[in-house]
Amino acid sequence: MRKIIIFDLDNTFYNYENSHSAALNAVFSSQKEFDDYEKFFIKYEETKKKVQKRLLGNPSRHSKLIYFKELFHEKIDLQKIYELESIYWESFINSTEIDKETVNLLSNKKGSSDLYYLFTNQNTNIQLKKINTWGLDFFDLVITSEEVGFEKPDHNFFNYADNFIADYTNKKDSKIYSIGDDYRNDIKFWQEKYSSNSYLIDNNMSESKF
């Protein structure tokens, strides 16, 4: 029987907080407006909350470029703001530790008819950079909240993603699996609709069994 495995990316294949912390430290070291990291971090968090409240439900609410643009408003020029966002993501991606054994396991476990789908919140450009840099080249389909216009767990996101799954399940020749770090975002919809075998994990894919 065909396996359709629905993955999340962030904080599923790696520890998000470790990568984010390394990236913020790199940004702090590359600017001169703040001379104390704690003050910089507090101001960053305040800015992030303000942006996310304003853009509630909009996938752009996670944009680091928007955060930095507001954080450094009238302090540095736009070119420098753009550079800081690039520094953030370069550091984030390069500092992330991906378990190679996990990647090899997933690649080796994938049968010829199996499908690996990645459904993720975030910017499409950044998510593709992550999976390409980290060697996660086994996905048959990648869908981001940016291209859908809604974030998980919004039902509009799941309804769009489900279009790519329903045809297979209607043939009754497929089994659905869902894997992620957040029940509402990654598992609940698929479990309720397809009785998916689900794995709620904490940055350790080796705990999952197929």
Regions found by a protein language model. Name each.
Residues M1-K3, V103, S107, Q122-F210:
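Asp-based, Mg2+/Mn2+-dependent phosphohydrolase catalytic module
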Residues M1-E46:
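Active-site neighborhood of HAD-like aspartate-dependent phosphohydrolases
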Residues I87-Y117, H155, N159:
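Short, acidic loop-to-helix structural element flanking the phosphoryl-transfer center
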Residues A22-A26, I66-E70, N104, N156, ...:
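Alpha-helical elements of Rossmann-like donor-binding domains used by nucleotide-donor carbohydrate transfer enzymes
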Residues K49-I87:
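A metal-dependent, Asp-based hydrolase signature
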Residues K32-E46, H73-S86, F138-F139, Y168-S174:
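Short, surface-exposed acidic
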Residues H20-F28, Y44-K48, F68, E85-W89, ...:
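Hydrophobic alpha-helical core bundles mediating ligand binding, dimerization, or RNAP-core interactions
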